[in-house]
Amino acid sequence: MKAQSAFSDQFPYLITSWESLFKLNQGLHDNHSKEVSMNRFRPNIVVQGVDDLEKMTGSDLSCDEGDYRFGLRKPCKRCKIVTINQDTGEIMEPKEPLATLVKLKFSDAIKGAFFGQNAILLSKDCAIRVGDELKLSS
């Protein structure tokens, strides 16, 4: 399979969820910090209806139509770039949202600030469409 990806880190895809962002923003609010937008994390794909996406390592995310399937390989460890507002260049309180992400840890075994899942495409080339119905399987 031939694949190309620009500006990627270790994996070609970063998948995040609106539920994870909501949980993070609740934590930021509780810490009296400003909320952040999804563009702060620069995901390729954002899904809705998946709680605790960061805990889903080893699962597959696929289109109900069977057109494509992603393998969720590991939670994405976040660096200090997420402290920078992508629209203004303003730096948040130097430790946010990283400090809150650490507090929201998804596992006692792994330390750090994580948001989203690094993923690979397990199926043929495909078109991903806004509104696709997805299913999560282990």
List where the protein language model places each region.
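Metal-cofactor-dependent catalytic cores
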Residues: M1-S138
